[in-house]
Every structure is written in C-alpha cells, then in structure tokens.
Amino acid sequence: MARETVEVVGVSPASPEAVWSVVSDFCGQWHPAIATIHAERDARGALVRAFTAHGESTVYREQLTWLSDSDRTLAYTHLEGIAGAQSYDGRIAIGAGDHGGSTLRWSARVEAASPRLQAICEGTKAILEAGIAALSETTLATDAAEQPRPLPASAATRDIVIDGEPRLALTTTDSDGPLCLFLHGIGGSRGNWLPQLAAAGGVMRAAALDLRGYGGSALGRIQSTVEDYCDDILRVKEELGADRLVLVGLSLGSWIATSFAMRHPEMLAGLVLSGGCTGMSEASLEERETFRVSRKVPLDAGQTPADFAPAVVKVLAGPNASDAVKEQLFRSMAAIPSATYRDSLVCFTNPSERFDFSRLTMPVLMMTGEHDRLASPSEIRGVAGRILDQASRPDIRYETIPDAGHVCNVEQPAAYSRILLDFLRKLPR
C-alpha cells in the first residue's frame, strides 16, 4: 500500500477561539459539502460522526481520536465510506496569526493501493480546501469567551475502611455506574481529591483512596511494589462491587494507574492521567538513582516530610498559587510518615517495566498544569501523542490546565473538574 499526506493551510480574520468554537464541534454541520450529519457513540464511548455529502447516498463515518481545547487541535480516523482507503487519518490545528486572526492547518494521511490513492488524495484536497475556505470567509460568531458550565451539586460522601493486609482507607460516594477511583501523588492524600470526588459522584460512583501508608491506610510489612498498589485497587474494586473502573491519577498516582491499565485493560472504562504517566520507567538507571538519593538525603539525615515540606511546596506550586493552596500542599506533605515517604520513593524509582501503549484500549484523558515543573505540558502532550500513535483505536484528550502547577486539581479545582466531568459523561454506563 502507498501512502500520501494532503495538507491545506489558510487564514481567517476571526480569532483562534472563534474558529475553534466552530471546528471543535466534531459533529457540527459547518462544512459546505455535508448534507446530513449526526453523532454516534461506539461501545467505549468514543465520538463518531456519520454524514452524507451533497449529491451522494454513501454514509461516511469518522471517529474522533484526539481532542485538545487548550491546543486547539483535533484528529480523526476514517471508519467507512471511502472506497479503497486502507487507512485515512485527518488532523486540524488552529493557531494565532502573525498579524491577528487565525491560521488554519488541515491535513490527511491516506493509505491506499496506488491506482486509487491519487483519486482519494485529489478528492481530499478539494474537501479540505472547501472547509478552509468556509472557515476563512464566514463571519464567525462573536469572539466573546464562552461561559463555563456550572459544576453539578456535590454528591454526599462517606469514609470507609477496608480491613485486611494492609488496611485501606477511602472516601466514597454512593452513586451508580462504574467506579471512578482517584489516586493521589507521592506528597498527597485522598483529601487532595475531595472537590473532584464530590463532582464525579454526580455522574458515577466515585472514591478517593489513601495509598498504603498514607492517611488512614496502613503501610505493608515489606517494601511496596507497583504490583502491591495494583492489588490494592483490585481490593477496592471488589469491596465496592464495581464491574469496571475509571482510574484518575496525579503524578505517582498516574504511574500506578497506567501500571494497572497495562495489567488489566479490560477492567477499565477510562483512564485519566494528571501531571505524569510513565513515572521513571523511561529514565536511565543513573537518572533513577540520582532522583532517589537526592530525595533520601534529608530522610537519612533524620528529617521528616514536615521538615522539608516548605521546599517541596516551592517546586509543586505554580507562580500564582494562593496562600490557601500552598497551605493545603504543605499540610498534605507534612502529614506523611517518613517510612511511607521512603517506601513510596523506593517503589517509584524501581519501575518494573516500560509501558506498551498499544495495550491502552480505553479512552484516555491527560492533563497537566501550565506551570508544572515536574511534568511539563510539552512532556505530557508528547506522551499523549505517543498513545495516539500506538493505541490500536485511540480516543485521547489532552488539556493544559491554565495557571496551575504540578498538583493541578488542587490549584484549579473547578477547571480540572469540568474537563474530568466532560470525559466521564461520555463513558458508557
């Protein structure tokens, strides 16, 4: 099979936000060639548009594979309708113009047998040009910023303890549906997730877990491994009677969530990764050891997490973090027992595998803070792009949380929760 890429670039006098408000409506009828269009969802909740073109009876179907409101990019793949196309993947990016207005870049990568490839590419070029022209010439809606939707009423929560080895403590809601389980970072606790827990509980059952050794959970008798964390997730799933899970992680919690997804992809209805994903699984042995030793030095000197919490907060917090946010981050860090912090650190710096993203069969949402020093937008965007490339049928969303540092759900809880709820609402029950 031969491959070819078609690309069309244009400009619009409208702002990038105004153009994106049109383009991001994946099932909107803004393209002049479209006669009819409607939205469908596949079994995983992925968005599919089914449409016909003027003068044709063929029904075309395309699945949204990538969406980023913060980057103003989307990608899609052809499912049916184009005769002879082995594969067909499109991408649209809206950027700021050099002298105001917007730049519009639309491309499609086509794979087909050589005799048919040229005809598909010629037809594609005409379609892309017509779409770019429509976006360039049409007077788009006002550039006024769209008002965010209000968050739903908070769901009631309760604390429970799962007895066993080790004891696990969590806060949960009593809603129905898959279980949305929140996993905190190395310097956090389940309390970091309370705003998201209450919001998610209005969509499905939700729970925030204290990882072993944190908060109300007990530390195991021997050094923890990522397998132990995955077993703890299975215990929570069984205790709460959940058929499927949506894992939501932050930093260390993101690495644990991805590790679980590698082992049990069939159990996950969705995967949400914030401020991390690969952990130290792609770092060299020297890099991992340097990281571990540098963070063990204060512990070996007899300090506790409470002693070095102020220095940690300076790294975690964004430049505009409020005093209240900094105080919350400090309290979370200061409450961690030294043995727990050491245990988590050793586990985190001894990953057992490098992730195979082709195993991620579920919808994935990735987020990070604009000012995250530990998991920068460029890094997390890059990982999301690799998942897009390697997953067999990707359904990926990536967002940068404005004006947030590493613990983006704590610094910008409303912005984080809105994106999370958009993701949860699309998942099948």
Predicted segments — roles?
Residues 1-43:
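Hydrophobic ligand-binding cavity/cleft-lining segments
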Residues 31-32, 38-41, 54-101, 109-111, ...:
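Hydrophobic-ligand binding "helix-grip"
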Residues 116, 258, 262-263, 268-301:
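Flexible "cap/lid" loop of the alpha/beta hydrolase fold
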Residues 282-289, 301-358:
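Conserved alpha/beta-hydrolase catalytic His-Asp/Glu region
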Residues 361-404, 415:
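Conserved loop-alpha-helix segment in the C-terminal half of the alpha/beta-hydrolase fold
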